[in-house]
Regions:
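Extended catalytic core of nucleotide-activated donor transferases of GT-like folds
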Residues: 2-84
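A short, active-site helix/loop in glycosyltransferases that binds the activated sugar's phosphate group
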Residues: 73-123
Length: 123
């Protein structure tokens, strides 16, 4: 609860007045109230699979990737291709270099799936 209050205070210092909800794994459904889940990383695939239990329209997902060089980041980016993400979900790429690399990784994974299992449809 202290983290929520601290975060609310920070938002208020920037002139924002939105309510801040604390969502725990036991209360995942509270994300419907928030309407968007910001995750400070590119791991949106895992989060989109969790969301399926509540419906794809329950909330949107927003992630960010600052680096794409680590194996964890690369795995997360590859996972985006086959995850149940929707057009209202987004991954923030803070530079054109990061965006270019993200798009290259995603396209390489799509090409791999085309070649290996004759995949033809991607979202």
């Amino acid at each position: 609860q202290e983290e929520v209050e601290n975060f609310s205070h920070i938002l208020n210092s920037f002139g924002r007045s939105e309510n801040v909800l604390q969502v725990t794994k036991r209360r995942y459904s509270r994300l419907r109230e928030a309407s968007v889940l910001y995750y400070p990383g590119p791991d949106l695939g895992k989060l989109s699979r969790h969301r399926r239990f509540f419906g794809d329209h329950a909330w949107s997902l927003c992630g960010i990737t600052h680096t794409t060089a680590s194996s964890g980041a690369m795995d997360a980016l590859v996972d985006l291709v086959t995850s149940p993400l929707r057009e209202w979900d987004g991954l923030v790429c803070p530079s054109s270099a990061v965006k270019g690399h993200v798009l290259n990784v995603i396209e390489a994974q799509k090409e791999y799936l085309r070649r290996e299992i004759a995949a033809t449809k991607f979202t």
